């Protein structure tokens, strides 16, 4: 069935056209259903623009006063949920402008002087994204604080370190968690760096070529807290690289949290049993009464794919566009909004979930006995006695094979049995083969010795203060 055009009010741009837009096209092209969440940023940008227009003598002081009065009322209506969003008015910008004009008359019609929706929306997005980044950085800090608390409580709690999911060498649980702290530190650095490029003002670029009005872009930048203006009008309205950069930083952060989630899931499994997770982060089964499922970490893994998808969506959106603005760019907002929402929700729940970890230290220690975790320490011991490393490696490999055949761990061998693999072995070898001895020997910066883990936590807290 062919869609027909219904009677509708004139568009802000309708003078050029001989027939109204069809209902189908109207629905297909409207963005107000999702870009209305930038309403407060749109009002902030419009107020700064109006103040600049009045300062430059482009509109009168009474016009500015009327615009400010109208915007106060509109802001209140939006905050109270009373604002009537209208699909006929396409987007957040025209909805607010139309309401302003209804409230104050001609001053509302003068607001758009020297401005296009192209630079207006670019400004709104940057203001919105700047606010989102600030919230994300605060949440990363909260997550880090709680992570450091758990790491400090377990700075000396031994557990297996793994490679290829095989027991490799002893580490401490605190040291393991500090690896994720370092990842989150880099995540915060990326968002902080991204914010610098977000914080540039596009307003004044107008549609694409600038404007003939004597505007003062630097004044608007100061009013809105931007560090500087965008230096090329075409670039200002047509690129969304700052949004792509934000999504890339988000994808990396979510990837790090996804890896931690995978470990929490494994550690919580009865087959591993290293931790338990507070009940408030788990769910049960509708059929199996014994189940306690780690749904939150599993959803973090799943939502990481969602954020990765948004990054690819934005890259694909931009890759074939000629300069300057194209309607394609309307599709930037939903992936961007969804990414920010997902990251914020994930960080909020993760900051709490970290505090809900209950460590099963005995299970961690028992696991160290199953994989010959101190074999490398024995090899290093022989090297320090003068044996070349490759020869020491071979001697210890033979000892491990013998231990497997006997069904014991290396510290369970007698001194004579160990000497059968190398005459360099002395009575001091048993101190080397203990878990505590292995941990204590990694006493350099970045090592897993408990005092080094505590020092790393102290440094981290100092930088986070």
From Swiss-Prot:
Gene that encodes the chain: argH
UniProt subcellular location: Cytoplasm
An individual GO BP term: arginine biosynthetic process via ornithine
EC number, as in UniProt: 4.3.2.1
Family: Belongs to the lyase 1 family. Argininosuccinate lyase subfamily.
Alphabetized GO MF terms: argininosuccinate lyase activity
PANTHER family reported in the protein's UniProt record: ARGININOSUCCINATE LYASE
One Pfam family from the record: ASL_C2
GO cellular component: cytosol
InterPro entries the UniProt entry points to: Arg_succ_lyase_C (IPR029419), Argininosuccinate_lyase (IPR009049), Fumarase/histidase_N (IPR024083), Fumarate_lyase_CS (IPR020557), Fumarate_lyase_fam (IPR000362), Fumarate_lyase_N (IPR022761), L-Aspartase-like (IPR008948)
Catalysed reactions, semicolon-separated: 2-(N(omega)-L-arginino)succinate = fumarate + L-arginine
Origin: domain of life: Bacteria
CDD domains: Argininosuccinate_lyase (cd01359)
Keywords of the record: Amino-acid biosynthesis, Arginine biosynthesis, Cytoplasm, Lyase
Keyword check for Ribonucleoprotein: no
Taxonomic lineage from the root: Bacteria, Pseudomonadati, Pseudomonadota, Betaproteobacteria, Rhodocyclales
Keyword Lyase attributed: yes
Pathway noted in the entry: Amino-acid biosynthesis; L-arginine biosynthesis; L-arginine from L-ornithine and carbamoyl phosphate: step 3/3
The protein's name: Argininosuccinate lyase
